[in-house]
Amino acid sequence: MGFIGKSVLVSLVALWCFTSSVFTEEVNHKTQTPSLAPAPAPYHHGHHHPHPPHHHHPHPHPHPHPPAKSPVKPPVKAPVSPPAKPPVKPPVYPPTKAPVKPPTKPPVKPPVSPPAKPPVKPPVYPPTKAPVKPPTKPPVKPPVYPPTKAPVKPPTKPPVKPPVYPPTKAPVKPPTKPPVKPPVSPPAKPPVKPPVYPPTKAPVKPPVSPPTKPPVTPPVYPPKFNRSLVAVRGTVYCKSCKYAAFNTLLGAKPIEGATVKLVCKSKKNITAETTTDKNGYFLLLAPKTVTNFGFRGCRVYLVKSKDYKCSKVSKLFGGDVGAELKPEKKLGKSTVVVNKLVYGLFNVGPFAFNPSCPK
């Protein structure tokens, strides 16, 4: 305990002794007041004069100081207990509360109450509690300091790399022209002889023969017909109702027994007729007076049909106005032999009749 702690403790003990003595004196004075005059006791705290009407007391009233012996005991006990448990920090609060309460109560209540009650009420406990509470506090623990942190080493900075400077370019010197040396003629090399190869034989050219003229082919003329008789072939169909208005044979069917007529215009009108077979095919032989030399004046007409439901001549390939004869140009098929007579073969058509379709 330091010097400051000791001085505070001594002053606290002295203050406690003073307040306890004052309080006990007040209590003793209250106990003596019932036998005295009705004047208030607190104002005659010194020598008390006897009341005039009571003459049987020859001597004045004994002084109220004898009860002052009681405050002597507390100071003796009080200093003994504090040294046993020296508080580190003396509490200051209890001493201030104890002296405030006792002085205020006596002036409020007049000393009219019976003498038996005042000794019971005196607050003897507060003075005793005040010195007791301070030592009961546990000794103040030494301040716990936070664990000392290990000295933080400053972060080691990475070794500072020396600044890398770009490679300093060598000072570009202006191109110093080399000293112009006199033109040194290179040493005259001996003339390099070209490698001597064996004489290459000239390519043997084939003997140039005079240009052979391509064989002159005679001009191809259309096959010349010998004078022959005329035979005309073709087919006849019945058009379908769906395509009756079009010049097409889609859906058409061959007609059997249809009549075809050949007309050759000359000095004499020559005619010939024939009918178709079940496949609609016909071969019309011209009269023997008509030869292949005069076929250009001949025409073939579609005359009539055996089927009355399909008998209207259509305009397909000129069957209604007469179709021109076209000679067959395929070799080997341009002639036909009938009854040991050779006929030149010509083509017409195909022809067709329009059907009578329901509306």
Swiss-Prot record:
Expressed in vascular bundles of roots, leaves, sepals and stamen filaments, and pistils but not stigma. It comes from the Eukaryota. Residues 67-215 have a biased composition (Pro residues). One of its GO terms (biological process) is response to jasmonic acid. Its main location: secreted. Keywords: Cell wall, Glycoprotein, Hydroxylation, Proteoglycan, Repeat, Secreted, Signal. Residues 31-215 are annotated as: Disordered. Residues 1-24 form the signal peptide. Sequence repeats lie at residues 90-109, 122-141, 142-161, 162-181. Proteoglycan that may contribute to the strengthening of cell walls. This is Non-classical arabinogalactan protein 31. It comes from Arabidopsis thaliana. The gene is AGP31.
